[in-house]
């Protein structure tokens, strides 16, 4: 029996642990996905509620994933990748969320919004839209600057 007094946000292995804690199973990806960008579609629920784009790119580093054939009845899918991997889960009753990707990664542009949505579930004030846009513009500018640096000078 689960009693969640505090909101929980699982990232990558934490996402998989949430799935398994409720009786789900994992599947092994072949090949593993490490440092790759993937498009994710979401339903604007849970930690995705502040993301206006129906589809966006995220950074993935994993070789295991929640098996959709064994999804626990207490959880529902909030996001999936184009290749059918569960990328977001949410508990039906408690404030328990998981994402398979890394919202903290520099290449996951909606990461600020995802983390902010979770923090709002914890009672913290989320950023204003103008602050999100400012952070995202700075991040995109930084990525463009880093990409211009030659790797083999």
Model-derived segments and spans:
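Phosphate-binding/catalytic loops
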Residues: 55, 100-109
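Acyltransferase
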Residues: 106-153
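Active-site donor-binding loop signature of nucleotide-sugar glycosyltransferases
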Residues: 31, 42, 91, 101-103
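Histidine-centered divalent metal-coordination motifs
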Residues: 12, 62, 102
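Cysteine-nucleophile active-site neighborhood
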Residues: 1-50, 115
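Conserved hydrophobic/aromatic beta-strand scaffold that supports enzyme active sites
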Residues: 37-39, 86-88, 98
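Catalytic beta-strand/loop cores that center a nucleophilic Ser/Cys/Thr
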Residues: 46-94
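Hydrophobic/aromatic beta-strand patches that form the interior of the parallel beta-sheet core
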Residues: 9, 27, 59, 78, ...
């Amino acid at each position: 029996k689960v009693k969640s007094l505090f909101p929980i946000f699982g990232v990558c292995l934490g996402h998989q642990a949430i799935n398994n804690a409720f009786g789900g199973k994992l599947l092994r990806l072949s090949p593993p996905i490490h440092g790759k960008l993937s498009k994710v579609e979401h339903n604007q629920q849970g930690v995705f509620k502040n993301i206006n784009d129906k589809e966006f790119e995220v950074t993935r580093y994993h070789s295991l994933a929640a098996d959709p054939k064994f999804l626990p009845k207490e959880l529902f899918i909030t996001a999936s990748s184009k290749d059918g991997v569960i990328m977001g889960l949410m508990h039906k009753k408690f404030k328990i969320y998981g994402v398979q990707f890394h919202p903290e990664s520099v290449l996951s542009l909606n990461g600020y919004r995802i983390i902010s949505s979770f923090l709002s579930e914890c009672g913290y004030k989320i950023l204003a839209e103008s602050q999100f846009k400012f952070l995202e513009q700075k991040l995109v500018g930084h990525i463009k600057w880093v990409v211009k640096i030659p790797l083999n000078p």
